[in-house]
Amino acid sequence: MDEFHRCGKEDSFWQQCFLYPLFFQEDLYAISHDHYLDVSSSSRPMEHLSSNDQLSFLTVKRLIGQIRQQNHSIVLFVNCDPNPLADRKKSFYSESVLEALTLVLEVPFSIWSKSSVEGMNECKSFRSIHSIFPFLEDKFPHSNSILDARIPYSIHPEILVRTFRRWIRDAPSLHPLRSVLYDYRNSPENLQRSIIVVPRVNTRFFLFLLNYYVWECESILFSRLKRSSHSRSLSHGSFPQRTHFHRKIKHIIIFSRRNSLKSIWSLKDPKIHYVRYGERPIIAIKGADLLVKKCRYYLLIFRQFYFHLWSEPYRVCSHQLSKNCSSSLGYFLRVRMNPLLVRTKTLDELFIPVLITNEMDPIVPIVPIIGLLATEKFCDISGRPISKLSWTSLTDDDILDRFDQIWRNLFHYYSGSFDRDGLYRIKYILLLSCAKTLACKHKSTIRVVRKELGPELFKKSFSKEREFDSLPFSSKAAARSQRERIWHSDIPQINPLANSWQKIQDLKIENLFDQ
């Protein structure tokens, strides 16, 4: 891959016109063959691996040669081996070809994406989900409305191929991509659809398609929003704080006026802020309702004309931050007013004015999470703890570790909320559910179990809370610990319960608009 990158940088003609010969390089199929075996061996038992899982480069070349002679390249997935025994081998050959196709297409895409990211000095990527919230805390309180825009996964295969043609002029190299997409569209599960739905599976090929599709949408959207923004700038990263005056000068523009020696100093304050996690981009807008309606209309028209795709209205929802809450990343996001008392003393009298500032207030959805716990049989629908009968066959240590891990993950993920009282209600449910599960296993009572285990119940969680409360916020850490929020930098993915609740919220919105 490094060799491909170096060649691509040295000769732009190569990356445009010489991708197709890479399909006939045996080294490429050896790499894809080894990668597929590594992935498949980790996901299936060792007894399913046999010596028949060998790759014939001659067969692969013959398959690629037949691609041009087929309408939809059914030969890619059917009759790819003369042996009638090999349904599994048919899948093996098709996956090997997909791996090779992905490797070839990743070469120019990695070069484009790297060059585009280098041109965006403000764009930053972090591994933790909680890195999004400091950006929201800085930008959301100064915005009026937000647009909750979902990236559509439904797109015609030919439109997807034409987006590649904008960057790759080597038309033969896109024939395998077109054949794979049409073959997937003609599969039994998609016979009733006129468009291809990019599946949410963890194969390298479809993940690459998803990443390219999102990158194509955002690269065009950024340039359009920059042109339409009032200040000619788009915020999609964390700017320096305005309290640092020596950095502040970098973000100031000077406009010279004619017939005057004075200059107008204007701060480059972006009016549009963009942040995305997964398929949920959020656009915060500071302006009148007319500007919000124009942005929403623009997003719908952009998808319709650029991707020839009719986007459902519910996929671009607008919310006023002062009135409504928006659900994202397992939180209810809202902006609340925070009054500040400022004492101003003069020689004659004392003034105590009240300053009102806006502050982002993420709320933990306690009731929906309890409903999800009821679905998983930790409690009933009213929130009363019950025993987890499916775990009674485990050992006591495994039961304790599982309940403890659920609570630690929840407490760790929702540590950014001011109001954590509801979390202790969830802890109470898990604690009694754990005790009832152990009592059901040993055919005893909760009192006996708590007497025998004592502090062993949620021992790790208690230590985690003590560590959380003892963080050095200031000299008055004990008093401020309940009023401070902490965004952690070690959370690579959304909490499972929060993710389940977020999907339920999305389905509710879709059903509301379908009615």
Curated annotation (Swiss-Prot):
It is found in: Plastid, Chloroplast. GO terms for molecular function: RNA binding. Coiled coil: none annotated. GO terms for cellular component: chloroplast. GO terms for biological process: mRNA processing; RNA splicing; tRNA processing. It comes from the Eukaryota. InterPro entries: Domain_X, Maturase_MatK, Maturase_MatK_N. Its main location: plastid. Keywords: Chloroplast, mRNA processing, Plastid, RNA-binding, tRNA processing. It holds the Pfam family MatK_N. HAMAP family: MatK (MF_01390). Usually encoded in the trnK tRNA gene intron. Probably assists in splicing its own and other chloroplast group II introns. Belongs to the intron maturase 2 family. MatK subfamily. This is Maturase K. The lineage of its organism: Eukaryota, Viridiplantae, Streptophyta, Embryophyta, Tracheophyta.
